[in-house]
Amino acid sequence: MQSQIVCHGCRNILLYPRGAPSVCCAVCHAVSSTAPSPGMDIAHLICGGCRTLLMYTRNATSVRCSCCDTVNLVRPVSSIAHLNCGQCQTVLMYPYGAPSVKCAICNFITNTGMNTMRHLPPNGTSYTAPSTSAPTTQSQNVTVVVENPMTVDAKGKLVSNVVVGVTTGGKK
């Protein structure tokens, strides 16, 4: 099984066998460590230009893709909001400012009014919706990711609209 890392010297993508402690770039001969430095919190995002998975440190504000040179803005935690689906009450996650969210479970479109929105806590912990139903003996959380149609922002660029829903699997 192989993994990928970006060369610290020339920014090329390097393939290496999983488990290797470091990899030497064939282009610039720089040695890159495959393990993140201690204390570094690593996050991932998908490049808006070429859809490549990018890895970056959490304190970054933007990430340049080494494949297509697109500069991807990193969305701060405070720009992600939650609301309950207007039909099945599944908790949905959406980018702050979106006018509506389509539920991946029941396909209901919920308007994102200020009275239904919940911000993600700033420490990065996940949101847990309070339960209004009787406790179940064995519930299993299911996470559903839906990519809604792309929209155009004020600068004329395409913007991805990704929705994440979490359900206990009780309602369909």
Swiss-Prot record:
This is Protein LOL2. It is found in: Nucleus. InterPro entries: LSD1-like, Znf_LSD1. Residues 4-34 are annotated as: Putative zinc finger 1. GO terms for cellular component: nucleus. Residues 44-74 are annotated as: Putative zinc finger 2. Putative zinc finger that may be involved in programmed cell death and defense response. The lineage of its organism: Eukaryota, Viridiplantae, Streptophyta, Embryophyta, Tracheophyta. Keywords: Nucleus. Residues 82-112 are annotated as: Putative zinc finger 3.
